[in-house]
Structure formats: structure tokens, C-alpha cells
Swiss-Prot record:
Annotated function: Component of the ubiquinol-cytochrome c reductase complex (complex III or cytochrome b-c1 complex) that is part of the mitochondrial respiratory chain. The b-c1 complex mediates electron transfer from ubiquinol to cytochrome c. Contributes to the generation of a proton gradient across the mitochondrial membrane that is then used for ATP synthesis.
Annotated GO MF terms: metal ion binding; ubiquinol-cytochrome-c reductase activity
Localisation per UniProt entry: Mitochondrion inner membrane
Cofactor comment text: Binds 2 heme b groups non-covalently.
Pfam families documented for this protein: Cytochrom_B_C (PF00032), Cytochrome_B (PF00033)
Membrane topology: Multi-pass membrane protein
Subunit structure: The cytochrome bc1 complex contains 11 subunits: 3 respiratory subunits (MT-CYB, CYC1 and UQCRFS1), 2 core proteins (UQCRC1 and UQCRC2) and 6 low-molecular weight proteins (UQCRH/QCR6, UQCRB/QCR7, UQCRQ/QCR8, UQCR10/QCR9, UQCR11/QCR10 and a cleavage product of UQCRFS1). This cytochrome bc1 complex then forms a dimer.
Binding-site positions, heme b b562: 83, 182
Family statement: Belongs to the cytochrome b family.
Gene: MT-CYB
Protein name: Cytochrome b
């Protein structure tokens, strides 16, 4: 068996990636989230495939086809809620994975980090299009509001929006193309994940201390396969609790009302995992400025390797940077909360302050604090 996995062309790739992979001996549970994201992606593709067998991408039947899945298809309710709540867990793991990368300086693996940012954008696009498919009130109005943001682009904006819609409003053509993209994108994500891993295995994993670990590495299997298994069990437990006890906890009640272009919901808001970016978008009164801030809220991650001014890679031994990091995390929680609130005071002011603080910490305070820490260490 050992000889086969080391000699067979296909088994050799798997062996070098998941079995005999030299891994730092001190990586903590924060490194579990990569494998958990792989599990989430697998769950989403599997459940999505079964949903696609029964779903009809047509404005007249989309809503009732989802109802049919929940009521008439064998375990259809389970598949549907696993898919919906699986997306939420996917984003929880994704944000934690990025947060861990920021904390321990993993952004210094520039190629891996940049592919990760492309992956984040792709996953967000996939999730957005998936949210439109049930064709409830929030699906329709969410699609209308978010796609309409492109009209802020000078000169080509209006034409671009109508091109995406396939008409003069969100309608049958929009739903059909969103379903097509929502179906194909997870496979593109899978390909990008392979590239992400390819670049990661070129450099090897980072570790909590941030110092090179060539002198102390252990094989991935059995040590980290067992460690990852614990994370897998906990994730599946969380998903089971969500799906079986509170399946609609993270959803919007408005989405149980069929889409009606003549009736606007009082508060249009996306799913919880987009609320931080939505709050940043709303905090700027100008439409084009808001769209620019929305894109920059994610794209700012690409600047992290350029703004790493610290002599130490990880934040493990940098208490000032740690304080700033946790303020940033708290700020993101505040932005998420604000994104779900109506546009009125004091929420407008809180949102604007939190948005300013978000960019201020990442673009200014973190690099300056790192320079200060270098001085304190006489580096």
C-alpha cells in the first residue's frame, strides 16, 4: 500500500498533499478551518446538486418549486436547510480563516493570499446569486438593489445593469442566468481551491510563532488528519443543531413571501455574512463612493502584504498589534449589526464611525503600530 501511494501518479499527488505532507508541529486549531472550508464546499456542492434536480429557474414556478422541495421531496427540507445553513457556516469558517491569516501573518505568502482573495470574491458572488433563487421578497429586492449599484459606474453603468438583468428589470432572464452561474461557480471555486493549495504547498504552512519551521516538521497523517476530524465533528454538530432545531434562525422572514415587484419590503438587507460590507456601502451618501467603499472593504486585504511593516511575522509576540486586531474584530461585529438596522439615527452615525475605523485600522494604525513595536524592540 505504501509503495502504491508513493508510485502511482494519481495517488502520489494525494500522498504529497494530504498524507506525507511535512507540516509544522506547533500549528493550533486555528489551522483547522482550511479543511473545514473544504468540507463546507463538498456539502454545498452535494446538497446543491440534489436541489437543482427539483428546482425550476422560472419566475412563475421558482418559489413554489422550493416549497415543493420542502414538502414533497424525500428529505427535501433537510437538503434545502443544509444548503442554506451550510452557506452560513461556510462564511463563518471563511471569515475565521482570513482572520487567522491576518493575525499570524499568513498574508506574507502573497500568491496564496491573493488566490484566497479571488476565492472570497467568487464565494460571495455565488452566495449572492444563490440567495436570489428562492424568488422570495428579499431575493427579488436584494437582487434589484445590489445589481443596481453597478449603475453608479460612469457612462456604461445603466447599460451594464440592463445587460446583467437581461431586460429593464430583474425578471425571468435574470433568474435563469443567476441559476446557471450559481450552478457553475462552485466548480470554478473547486479549481481555485486546488490552485490555492498548490501555492500553499510551494511554501509550506505558516505556524503561530511566525518563524521558519523547517527544522521541526511532522507528517500530516495521522497527526493532523485526527486533529481535523475533531473540527469536522464539531462543524457537523453545529450544522445539525442549526438545521434540525432552528433552520430559519439566520434567514429572513420576508423570503417566505413570494416576490412582488409592486411591494417593497420596509428594510431591504442581504444575508448576515454581507451585512458588514452593506453597512460600509450605506455609510457613504454618494452612490459611486459607496460602491467604491464596498469593493475596497474586501480588496483592502490585497494591500496587507504591502503594509506589513513589522519585523516579526506573527502578532503572537506583539501586544499592541493584538489590541488593534481585536478592536478590528469588534468593529466588524458592529458593522454587521448596523447593516441589519434601518437607515436612521443613531445607526447612521455609528455605521459611519465604524466604517471609518475599519479603514483607519487596516490602512494606518496597524502599519504605524508595527513600526512603533520595531522601535520598542530596538529593531
Amino acid at each position: 500500500m505504501t509503495i502504491m501511494r508513493k508510485q502511482h501518479p494519481l495517488a502520489k499527488i494525494i500522498n504529497h498533499s494530504f498524507i506525507d505532507l511535512p507540516t509544522p508541529s506547533n500549528i493550533s486549531s486555528w489551522w483547522n478551518f482550511g479543511s473545514l472550508l473544504g468540507l463546507c464546499l463538498t456539502i454545498q456542492i452535494a446538497t446543491g446538486l440534489f436541489l437543482a434536480m427539483h428546482y425550476t429557474p422560472d419566475t412563475t414556478t421558482a418559489f413554489s418549486s422550493v416549497t415543493h422541495i420542502c414538502r414533497d421531496v424525500n428529505y427535501g427540507w433537510l437538503i434545502r436547510y443544509m444548503h442554506a445553513n451550510g452557506a452560513s457556516l461556510f462564511f463563518m469558517c471563511l471569515f475565521t480563516h482570513i482572520g487567522r491569516g491576518l493575525y499570524y501573518g499568513s498574508h506574507n505568502f502573497v500568491e496564496t493570499w491573493n488566490i484566497g482573495i479571488i476565492l472570497l470574491f467568487t464565494v460571495m458572488a455565488t452566495a449572492f446569486m444563490g440567495y436570489v433563487l428562492p424568488w422570495g421578497q428579499m431575493s427579488f429586492w436584494g437582487a434589484t438593489v445590489i445589481t443596481n449599484l453597478l449603475s453608479a459606474i460612469p457612462y456604461i453603468g445603466t447599460s451594464l445593469v440592463e445587460w446583467i438583468w437581461g431586460g429593464f428589470s430583474v425578471d425571468k432572464a435574470t433568474l435563469t442566468r443567476f441559476f446557471a452561474f450559481h450552478f457553475i461557480l462552485p466548480f470554478i471555486i473547486t479549481a481555485l481551491v486546488m490552485v490555492h493549495l498548490l501555492f500553499l504547498h510551494e511554501t509550506g504552512s505558516n505556524n503561530p510563532s511566525g518563524i521558519p519551521s523547517e527544522a521541526d516538521k511532522i507528517p500530516f497523517h495521522p497527526y493532523y488528519t485526527i486533529k481535523d476530524l475533531l473540527g469536522v465533528i464539531l462543524l457537523l454538530l453545529m450544522l445539525s443543531i442549526l438545521v434540525l432545531f432552528t433552520p430559519d434562525l439566520l434567514g429572513d422572514p420576508d423570503n417566505y413571501t413570494p416576490a412582488n415587484p409592486l411591494n417593497t419590503p420596509p428594510h431591504i438587507k442581504p444575508e448576515w455574512y454581507f451585512l458588514f460590507a452593506y453597512a460600509i456601502l450605506r455609510s457613504i451618501p454618494n452612490k459611486l463612493g459607496g460602491v467604491a467603499a464596498l469593493i475596497m472593504s474586501i480588496l483592502v486585504l490585497a494591500l496587507m502584504p504591502l503594509m506589513h511593516t513589522a519585523k516579526q511575522r506573527s502578532m503572537m509576540f506583539r501586544p499592541l498589534s493584538q489590541c488593534l486586531y481585536w478592536i478590528l474584530v469588534a468593529d466588524l461585529f458592529i458593522l454587521t449589526w448596523i447593516g441589519g438596522q434601518p437607515v436612521e439615527n443613531p445607526f447612521i452615525t455609528i455605521g459611519q464611525t465604524a466604517s471609518l475605523l475599519y479603514f483607519l485600522i487596516i490602512l494606518t494604525l496597524m502599519p504605524l503600530t508595527s513600526i512603533l513595536e520595531n522601535k520598542m524592540l530596538k529593531w
